[in-house]
Amino acid sequence: MPIIERILAREILDSRGNPTIQVEVTTDYGTTGVANVPSGASTGSREALELRDKGTKYENNWFGGKGVMTAVDNVNEIIALELEGLSVFNQREIDKIMIDLDGTATKSKLGANAILGVSLAVAKAAAAELEMPLYRYIGGANAHVLPLPMLNVLNGGEHASNTVDFQEFMIMPVGSKSLRQALQMANKVFHNLAKLLKKAGYGTQVGDEGGFAPNCKSHEEVLDYLVEAIKIAGYTPATKGKNAIAIALDAACSELYDEKTKKYTFKKLKQAISEKRPGFEHLGDVKLEYTSDELIEYFGKLIDKYPIISIEDGLAESDWEGFAKMTAKYGHKVQIVGDDLTVTNPKLLEKAIEQKSMNAILIKLNQIGTLSETMDAINKAQKANMACVVSHRSGETEDTTIADLAVAFNTGQIKTGSMSRTDRIAKYNRLLVIEEELGEQSEFEGIKAFYNIK
């Protein structure tokens, strides 16, 4: 039985140039598993805590105290001593030991980034010991479904320095018959979108997740460009049918919400109008503030006008009542995804199931901090007939764990960025390899991934 012989953490850089943590786990057989931990920009307040160096002896190492040497030390000096000598196959025992060792609800003592790095590296070392891919080790013989990708082709919100308030505008090739075809379709739309934006006088610089970041004057303008790009690429902007490509949104409305006024404000657009930027002078009468009910109605108008199939974080993380209203109103035709609402937490997911707050959950490993708890959240959601969307973070690395996780649990959907930036493309490349490995055993469900819409 291979045991953990050494655990070593180090500081590396993520896709934004910020420090993050990498962990190596080596067994007594000489096998090593390596994991890099991602980092989010738009984060839910109930997420497990990412430990940074501000206020510590390492504070001045990196800009803004964003180093992770405190978390690195916690791995090398505390966690390693507890886990070395244990079987590398005892994933749940190892995760529980780390959870108990930390002793806080948000993993704030040792850091969720420290704990997650070890948790994932252990799983990778175990898979390597058995000479099998990670998706097979985690998911067993039943791991065979390739996920339909949500491709974030236009960025806004916290992910881009532009005038667009909603954070992500994504395309989903629901009419595709394979993962490869889905990526081919998305590729054509992405490059046609670039041409459209250039023609309109917008730059084609990209945001954190590889999507374009133009200074559009409304969400509708963005959606119009997406629809046009889909058509020019030779596909149909629709939520179903042959060659159909649908649209998905991540509104990230917690970032727009004011707890005092109980209103949502399109802050970036408001600023552009108040500063009278070129092209925004005539927008003085545009509605910029919404109550929860008004925002739900606004989404309804978008759903009626555009081929929208999924809306993530359409309301703030504290607006449980609003989420339930939105799901009751639109859940029969649109996927209502909870991200900040549930933060991959099985306990919060239970509340969402009871209150019928959503019909899909976003799965982010670093929101909860261990592989075991992530697996519990996925299992609980699937039993409740909720769809699971495995997701990246805005701060990523070349690590491709989430690609394997999506296949391991047959989630049917993955959200991992646009058709640019190596940190995003790495996940798609990993999925293409998995598709090839599985061959005829693989299944790609396309529109069937939305079994939760009814």
Curated annotation (Swiss-Prot):
GO CC term (a single one): cell surface
Location in the cell: Cytoplasm; Secreted; Cell surface
Catalyzed reactions: (2R)-2-phosphoglycerate = phosphoenolpyruvate + H2O
Key word S-adenosyl-L-methionine present: no
Cofactor: Mg(2+)
Binding site for Mg(2+): 250, 312, 339
Cofactor note: Binds a second Mg(2+) ion via substrate during catalysis.
Protein name (database record): Enolase
Organism: Mycoplasmopsis agalactiae (strain NCTC 10123 / CIP 59.7 / PG2)
Organism classification: Bacteria, Bacillati, Mycoplasmatota, Mycoplasmoidales, Metamycoplasmataceae
Record gene name: eno
